[in-house]
Amino acid sequence: YFVDTQDFPTTGDFVMIRYVDDGDSLILTTLPRRTYFSRREPGPIPRDQAVAANFDYVFIMQSLNMDFNPKRLERYLTLAWQSGATPVILLTKADLVEDYWDYLMEVDRVATGVNTHVVSAQTGYGLNHLNRYLQPGNTVVFLGSSGVGKSSLVNALAGAV
């Protein structure tokens, strides 16, 4: 940083730089964030530390198996709304259940009005419904517990599966 009065940029930040011919360009400032996720920075003085910025949608992922947890979904929805972005709920691993109607009813109870999609990265089921969010100029953050299929979904959307 040129001036030491700002936090370092985070994923998604836009910055102003001063280009230097030797390749060691300087960040002059971080531009204002439209949306962001933060966490409490560890240490004796609690303060927020941004972990992602300037995204349009938060894909909140819960798998249709033993991982499904309405209380966790509520917490993730709160984080998404606080970020300033639009939450979208993805119920993953549709290939592992015969009937997902009860899950959809529970999601509707917890998150009335939030767009919800049932998907499977393995079979491709429901992925076409995500195209409306994945348009040029849109940025998406994936939020979910370990094992819900975040990496598998990214790979499927990128055509690697």
Across the structure, where does each feature detected by a protein language model lie?
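Residue-level signal for inorganic ion chemistry
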Residues: 12, 80, 92
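Short, flexible, glycine/charge-rich loop motifs used to bind or transfer phosphoryl groups or to couple energy/partner
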Residues: 5, 47-49, 78, 106-107, ...
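Structural beta-sheet core signal
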Residues: 60, 89-91
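Conserved G1/Walker A P-loop phosphate-binding module
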Residues: 2-21, 27-30, 125-161
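Histidine-anchored nucleotide/phosphate-binding helix
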Residues: 71-82
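Canonical P-loop GTPase G-domain recognition
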Residues: 86, 93-148
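N-terminal accessory targeting/assembly segments
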Residues: 1-70
